[in-house]
UniProtKB/Swiss-Prot annotation:
InterPro entries membership: AAA+_ATPase, ABC1_TM_dom, ABC1_TM_sf, ABC_transporter-like_ATP-bd, ABC_transporter-like_CS, P-loop_NTPase, Pept_C39_ABC_bacteriocin, Peptidase_C39
Designated name of the protein: Lactococcin-A transport/processing ATP-binding protein LcnC
GO biological process: protein transport; proteolysis
Organism name: Lactococcus lactis subsp. lactis (Streptococcus lactis)
Gene3D superfamilies for this protein: ABC transporter type 1, transmembrane domain (1.20.1560.10), Cysteine proteinases (3.90.70.10), P-loop containing nucleotide triphosphate hydrolases (3.40.50.300)
Length: 715
């Protein structure tokens, strides 16, 4: 099958190359799926997409897949099954995928998901040096039916625009009147040259001049009103576009955040700004520039048809310029947005990890990495700006050539007395009101292309379904027993992190889960709050499957407290009340901070509970953060608390006090701990090793078994 250029798909984020390669093959057979959907099907993780993940995703879409390790002899075959996916190590460092579209004696033709490369050819020697030999060959099954997933285009923003129709109408009216005044000014110039000066009409000249001055004052008032209304429109569009993106981000499942770098998510805000810019410009061009072009075109035609026809000859030149630059701008916009996302990720990562960087004296090393990425971003941005400048230069040359030609030809008409000097000057003055709107319409090309690329990137987020998409009614529970039956879990299509877990936890039980690092303890409890879905098995709360719960209700009933809790910018009181029972009383707040052994620390601060904290409370110790977070959890309405190493930064004495405070509470508490002093005090201990529950019982019982727990305890 011959690969068509229209089937090319570029990756949007760093880890999308496998899904983008699969998308190209699917398009060749008539199926169109977003990268967001393919990521879900292929189990893409923060490390990328495995060949097994691509195979599984293709099989779900009714394709048969052969994954083979082949060699260069594949390209000697007369009927090689092009296109197919090849796994490579790019630049001898990065795992990557190409779509192989063909080959000849010396070259291999590839479609690289990297938007900076796209479709190209490599020498066989260069390709073979990168190729791991792993190839995926896809063919349709008898049950295959092409499917097309709809992605929203820029047209989807029309409802947002129509909601602002009053503001837009006022902007258009103001702009229209301003243009009319400018046109009247041009005719004033013609009358002055052709009538008032030759006939010495001083009185008429004075009256007309004062009248024109008044209209110019009105014009400036309208210009101010237009600028004000444009700001209003811009802010309202920002609320609709940017806030809707933030709202959607908050509704996405944890699996979305665990498979993407922070910068990839935050860089979409600048993408949204590109869309806003394009929307505002398009509104003005559609409603205003087109109207002005038609109106001034009629006036110019009435003024002198010969000169106007000369003007019309320049329009095809503008169109040719647009067509030539379209593919170039698309490629360069992709490059700029992608390198910007990588740069943002690195900066956020390094600021968050600044303490570690300083502790390792690695400032220079990390700076050099950002320096390289920033230079790469600047290079791409400069290339785009250079292309825009070249296009601007060509358009300016066309416009200036047109102006000179009009004056030249117009002067010959004046000399031959076919038009007056005033008519020529007026025509030339009016010409800018015809060409400037056309230039504005042409300039939409770069903005709309940038917006189209930005919209594609936003779509990859919007197409990830909200975890709250399915409306569920709140359930009433007669008890709060937890039960896990035959639970297994794996990230993507990697190895199983949990395997066949059987576990029952009674209401108000105090249970500790222990095990080596990486044994699956944290993953196990994250399933209880539906951060991730089990690969197989069932979890019930109060005898009801967790999948039947509204997630908001579930997380109000089960509160998960991680080892590194986040403290938000604001006062200590604001942080304590986040997620708390509505109208939590002062007595309840004091009880929570006492149970968490943080009351004395807070009250010793100068402003007490009103003490302002910066992002992640860098002024507090790790132990203080953990205790504030614990008090916050105790103020929540949760019946079940999961403390994932939530006291690991505390000294042994404080930790023991907190445990003694928690054990009598009328709540189920699940501790995850490496310190076995925590386990000693709980009702029951669960020992997890390599994703399996291997022992269960009290501290005394497990020591008597001389098993894995006994080894942990003594070692």
């Amino acid at each position: 099958m011959k690969f068509k250029k229209k089937n090319y798909t570029s990756q949007v984020d760093e880890m999308d190359c496998g899904c983008a390669a699969l998308s190209m093959i699917l398009k060749s057979y008539g199926t169109e799926k977003s990268l967001a959907s393919l990521r879900l099907l292929a189990g893409t993780t923060i490390e990328g997409t495995s060949a097994l993940g691509i195979k599984k995703a293709a099989e779900i879409l009714e394709f048969s897949v052969q994954a083979l390790r082949t060699d260069a002899s594949l390209f000697e075959m007369k009927n090689a099954p092009y296109p197919f996916i090849a796994h490579v190590i790019k630049d001898q460092k990065y795992p990557h995928y190409y779509v192989i579209t063909g080959a000849n004696k010396n070259s291999v033709f590839i479609a690289d998901p990297d938007p900076t490369i796209k479709m190209t050819k490599l020498s066989k020697e260069a390709f073979l040096s990168e190729w791991t030999g792993i190839s995926l060959f896809l063919s349709t099954t008898p049950s295959y039916h092409p499917t097309k997933e709809k992605a929203s285009s820029l047209l989807s923003f029309i409802p947002i625009i129509t909601r602002q129709k009053k503001v837009i109408l006022n902007i258009v009216i103001a702009s229209f009147i301003v243009t009319l005044i400018n046109i009247l000014g041009s005719y004033y110039l013609q009358s002055m040259i052709d009538s008032y000066i030759p006939n010495a009409l001083m009185g008429t000249l004075g009256i007309i001049s004062v009248g024109l001055l008044l209209t110019y004052i009105i014009q400036q008032v309208l210009e101010f009103a237009k600028a004000f209304l444009l700001n209003v429109l811009s802010q309202r569009l920002a609320i609709d576009v940017i806030l809707s993106y933030i709202r959607h981000i908050f509704q996405l499942p944890m699996s979305f955040f665990s498979t993407r770098r922070t910068g990839e998510i935050t860089s979409r805000f600048s993408d949204a700004s590109s869309i806003l810019d394009a929307i505002a410009s398009t509104i003005l061009s559609l409603f205003l520039d087109l109207t002005i072009v038609v109106m001034t075109g009629l006036i110019l035609g009435l003024q002198n048809m010969q000169l106007f026809l000369l003007v019309l000859l320049a329009i095809p030149l503008y169109i040719v310029v647009i067509i030539i630059f379209t593919p170039l701008f698309e490629k360069q916009n992709h490059e700029v947005m992608q390198t910007n996302a990588v740069l943002n990720s690195s900066i956020i990562e390094d600021i968050n990890g600044i303490e570690t960087i300083k502790a390792l004296a690695s400032e220079q090393e990390r700076y050099q990495k950002i320096d390289y990425e920033f230079a790469s971003y600047l290079k791409k941005a400069f290339t785009l700006q250079k292309s825009e400048a070249i296009q601007g230069l060509i358009k300016a040359i066309i416009q200036l050539t047109l102006s000179v030609t009009i004056l030249w030809f117009g002067a010959t008409l004046v000399i031959s007395q076919k038009i007056t000097l005033g008519q020529l000057i007026t025509f030339n003055a009016l010409l800018s009101y015809f060409t400037n709107p056309i230039t504005n319409i042409i300039n939409l090309q770069t903005k709309l292309q940038k917006a189209r690329v930005a919209n594609e990137r936003l779509n990859e987020v919007y197409l990830v379904p909200s975890e709250f998409e399915e409306k569920k009614t709140e359930l009433s529970l007669s008890h709060f027993n937890l039960n896990m039956s035959d639970i297994s879990y794996q990230y993507g299509f990697g190895r199983k992190v949990l395997s066949e877990i059987e576990l029952s936890i009674k209401e108000n039980e105090k249970l500790t889960i222990v095990g080596m690092s990486g044994s699956g303890k944290s993953t196990l409890v994250k399933l209880l709050v539906n951060f991730f879905q089990p690969t197989s098995g069932t979890i019930t709360l109060g005898g009801i499957d967790l999948q039947q719960f509204d997630k908001h209700q579930l997380r109000r009933l089960i509160n998960y407290l991680p080892q590194q809790p986040y403290i938000f910018t604001g006062s200590i009181l604001d942080n304590l009340l986040l997620g708390a029972n509505e109208n939590a009383s002062q007595e309840e707040i004091l009880k929570a901070v006492e149970l968490a052994e943080i009351r004395a620390d807070i009250e010793q601060m100068q402003l007490g509970y009103q003490t302002e904290l910066s992002s992640d409370a860098s002024s507090l110790s790790g132990g203080q953060k953990q205790r504030i977070a614990l008090a916050r959890a105790l103020l929540s309405p949760a019946k079940i608390l999961i403390l994932d190493e939530a006291t690991s930064n505390l000294d042994m004495i404080t930790e023991k006090k907190i445990l003694k405070n928690l054990l009598p509470l009328d709540k189920t508490i699940i501790f995850i701990a490496h310190r076995l002093s925590v386990a000693e005090m709980s009702h029951r201990i669960i020992v997890v090793d390599q994703g399996k529950v291997i022992e269960s019982g009290s501290h005394v019982d497990l020591l008597a078994q001389n098993g894995f727990y006994e080894q942990l305890y003594h070692n």
